[in-house]
Amino acid sequence: MNAYNKADSFSLESDSIKDVIHDYICWLSMTDEMRPSIGNVFKAMETFKIDAVRYYDGNIYELAKDINAMSFDGFIRSLQTIASKKDKLTVYGTMGLLSIVVDINKGCDISNIKFAAGIIILMEYIFDDTDMSHLKVALYRRIQRRDDVDR
């Protein structure tokens, strides 16, 4: 998981958005005390949570509590729920929603690792290649914007 958590840059040509997301979800699944410090890549990933709050009509945290990938039935219900909200949330808000889901279920036992893995698998069903391309470009731009502000 240490590939991207401290990274400050992200390349559109050579870096994998899937790898970033997987590392980020694993990092989010840790308790606050256990999480290593982060660089600009994960700081930019955190901004997708803002999109989720901004684009969702209701309480995004209530919606996040209903997402469960720990059982087959929960996985299917979660997939249906997210798919029905994806147009309103946008791909960016959906990424933020899934980040919030992992963040509110964080911990340090094996069930948290399984939960994070379930969310990663859920993402594989939710995001197509076009969505991943949009997330990749958005992440790159958010990092660049952050670099411009920091200078």
Swiss-Prot record:
Family from the record: Belongs to the orthopoxvirus OPG029 family.
Pfam assignment, any one: Poxv_Bcl-2-like
Originating organism: Vaccinia virus (strain Western Reserve)
A GO biological process held by the record: symbiont-mediated suppression of host toll-like receptor signaling pathway
Domain of life (superkingdom): Viruses
MF term (GO), any: protein sequestering activity
Keywords linked to the UniProt accession: Early protein, Host-virus interaction, Inhibition of host innate immune response by virus, Inhibition of host interferon signaling pathway by virus, Inhibition of host TBK1 by virus, Inhibition of host TLR pathway by virus, Interferon antiviral system evasion, Viral immunoevasion
GO cellular component: host cell cytoplasm; host cell nucleus; nucleus
Function: Prevents establishment of cellular antiviral state by blocking virus-induced phosphorylation and activation of interferon regulatory factors 3/IRF3 and 7/IRF7, transcription factors critical for the induction of interferons alpha and beta. This blockage is produced through the inhibition of host TBK1, by binding host TBK1 adapter proteins TBKBP1 and AZI2, thereby producing a strong inhibition of the phosphorylation and activation of IRF3 and IRF7. Also acts as an inhibitor of the cellular response to type I IFN by interacting with host STAT2.
Induction record: Expressed in the early phase of the viral replicative cycle.
Assembly information from the UniProt record: Interacts with host TANK, TBKBP1 and AZI2; these interactions prevent interferon production. Interacts with host STAT2.
Protein name per the record: IFN signaling evasion protein OPG029
